[in-house]
């Protein structure tokens, strides 16, 4: 028995270690969540923008059939009707083509998968034509029957782990992942996505499922499809949605042995800092000292589709596209700092927190409109197309694994640091100018500041920085400038 247990433990360990690898193509980093985009539009974006600008991955909205809800809110996609690949974003053929096209240009696909639950009452028909009866827990499109669900009960006490994991989240019919038939169906669904070439999954509502059940499901998944450029034996990267701000019965540490987690404390803390509630000087020990999970277990972000709307965690401290100067600074810091696996949010604009994506007719999702300066219109925000963000993805790629060096701060809200001898950033969140001679760590030369502009041939469309033979440079960041950050790196040398 002891031997059998040891073998099981070793097997889980092997599974776990593989599941922390993002499976990114070499020389790339950073993923973007193209929230509610259509598959055909994502494929084109991989080819036209994400690939050429060094992005490593794209997180996509749920790919499986969901309940059609009145006024088509964004959250209808988190109400599954079946595992057929038919949504407002497109069908299976379009999704498969998207994954293939993105992989071909070095951009990996990560699917937001929902298998904690099925649709709540009122979700009687789906985007793929299936019908269901959530009130009787009948979902013939899978098929699931009442035998596959936990008994109906509500979650109202987050200090009771049994209730959080066995009862229904806001009325969503709660699947029993300990049931072998449910496990079979979930594995079948995820394996099908692996066959199509995806690199990993964001597991929605992982906190509401038992870690032991998830370990079984993850452990049964097939290895990634080598036809799509993955190394033989590669496992899907798994990032689990576990909101753990402390003080509840369930901790992210119960899940970090199985895969990475969505580190909501990062979002909350970075928001407080760049909103001026904490000083930038305190960022000197950014990382686990702030209560975050280990770096390779942390998917980090400034905001996500939930908390930008006040759902999830972080409340009013969360930064969004609606406060662009601070948002760009926080995003630049996240991308400049080596901690965690960063994910950039790409939103549609909203005034109502239930509002769905832009449509052509109230139902069919509209494609983003691209402007000459790379930005989007037509109701899409496209933060990933803001120069201050996509140029920092290139910065992250340029500095690689080089460590933070040459930390400087003014004892308040002005900081700077280098990433070895390959990149340098400075931030000013004070209400007075930053004007100092700082050690950049970089070789002598003239560099293009990739925040105010971009390198174009041998010139720069923004500010330039002259680094002396001693590595020092005069750094000026006016408090009233559009951007409170400056960044230079070896690939932006003129």
UniProtKB/Swiss-Prot annotation:
It catalyses: Endohydrolysis of (1->4)-alpha-D-glucosidic linkages in polysaccharides containing three or more (1->4)-alpha-linked D-glucose units. GO terms for molecular function: alpha-amylase activity; metal ion binding. Chloride binds at residues 202, 304, 343. Residues 1-18 form the signal peptide. Changing residue 381 to A: In strain: LO4. Changing residue 405 to P: In strain: LO4. InterPro entries: A-amylase/branching_C, A-amylase_C, Alpha_amylase, Glyco_hydro_13_cat_dom, Glyco_hydro_b, Glycoside_hydrolase_SF. The record marks 306 as: Transition state stabilizer. The modification Pyrrolidone carboxylic acid is found at residue 19. Disulfide bonds join 46-102, 153-167, 376-382, 448-460. Binds 1 Ca(2+) ion per subunit. Keywords: Calcium, Carbohydrate metabolism, Chloride, Disulfide bond, Glycosidase, Hydrolase, Metal-binding, Pyrrolidone carboxylic acid, Signal. The active site is at residues 204, 241. Changing residue 330 to V: In strain: LO4. Its EC number is 3.2.1.1. Its cofactor is Ca(2+); chloride. Ca(2+) binds at residues 116, 165, 174, 208. Monomer. Belongs to the glycosyl hydrolase 13 family. This is Alpha-amylase B. It comes from Drosophila yakuba. The gene is Amy-d.
């Amino acid at each position: 028995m002891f031997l059998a247990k040891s073998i099981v433990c070793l097997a889980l360990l092997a599974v776990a270690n593989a599941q922390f690898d993002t499976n990114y193509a070499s020389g790339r980093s950073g993923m973007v969540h193209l929230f509610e985009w259509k598959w055909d539009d994502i494929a084109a974006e991989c080819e036209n923008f994400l690939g050429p600008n060094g992005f490593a991955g794209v997180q996509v909205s749920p790919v499986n059939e969901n309940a059609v809800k009145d006024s088509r809110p964004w959250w209808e996609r988190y109400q599954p009707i079946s595992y057929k690949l038919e949504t407002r974003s497109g069908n299976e053929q379009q999704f498969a083509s998207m994954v293939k096209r993105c992989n071909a240009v070095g951009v990996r696909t990560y699917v937001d998968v929902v298998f904690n639950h099925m649709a709540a009452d009122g979700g009687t028909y789906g985007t793929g034509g299936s019908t269901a009866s959530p009130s009787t827990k009948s979902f013939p499109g899978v098929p699931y029957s009442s035998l596959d669900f936990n008994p109906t009960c509500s979650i109202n006490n987050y200090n009771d782990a049994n209730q959080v994991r066995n009862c229904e989240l806001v009325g969503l019919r709660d699947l029993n992942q300990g049931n072998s038939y449910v496990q079979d169906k979930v594995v079948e669904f995820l394996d099908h996505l692996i066959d199509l070439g995806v690199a990993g999954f964001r597991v929605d509502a992982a906190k509401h499922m038992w870690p032991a059940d998830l370990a079984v499901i993850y452990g049964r998944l097939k290895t990634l499809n080598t036809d799509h450029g993955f190394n033989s034996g590669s496992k899907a990267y798994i990032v689990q949605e576990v909101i753990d701000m402390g003080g509840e019965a369930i901790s992210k540490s119960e899940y970090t042995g199985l895969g990475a987690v969505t580190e909501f404390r990062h979002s909350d803390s970075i928001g407080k800092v760049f909103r001026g509630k904490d000083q930038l000087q305190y960022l000197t020990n950014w990382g686990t000292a702030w209560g975050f999970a280990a770096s390779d277990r942390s998917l980090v972000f400034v905001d996500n589709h939930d908390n930008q709307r006040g759902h999830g965690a972080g409340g009013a401290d969360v930064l969004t596209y609606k406060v662009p100067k601070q948002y760009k600074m926080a995003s630049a810091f996240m991308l400049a700092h080596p901690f965690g696996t960063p994910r950039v949010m790409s939103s549609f604009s909203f005034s109502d927190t239930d509002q769905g994506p832009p449509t052509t007719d109230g139902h069919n999702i509209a494609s983003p409109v691209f402007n000459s300066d790379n930005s989007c219109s037509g109701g899409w925000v496209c933060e990933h197309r803001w120069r201050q963000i996509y140029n920092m993805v290139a910065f992250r790629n340029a500095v690689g694994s080089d460590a933070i060096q040459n930390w400087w701060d003014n004892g308040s809200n002005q900081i700077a640091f280098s990433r070895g001898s390959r990149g340098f950033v400075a931030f000013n969140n004070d209400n007075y100018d930053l004007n100092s001679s700082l050690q950049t760590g970089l070789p002598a030369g003239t560099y293009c500041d990739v925040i105010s502009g971009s390198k174009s041939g041998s010139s720069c469309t923004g500010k330039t920085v002259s680094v002396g033979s001693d590595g020092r440079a005069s750094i000026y960041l006016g408090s009233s400038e559009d951007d409170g950050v400056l960044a230079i790196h070896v690939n932006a040398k003129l």
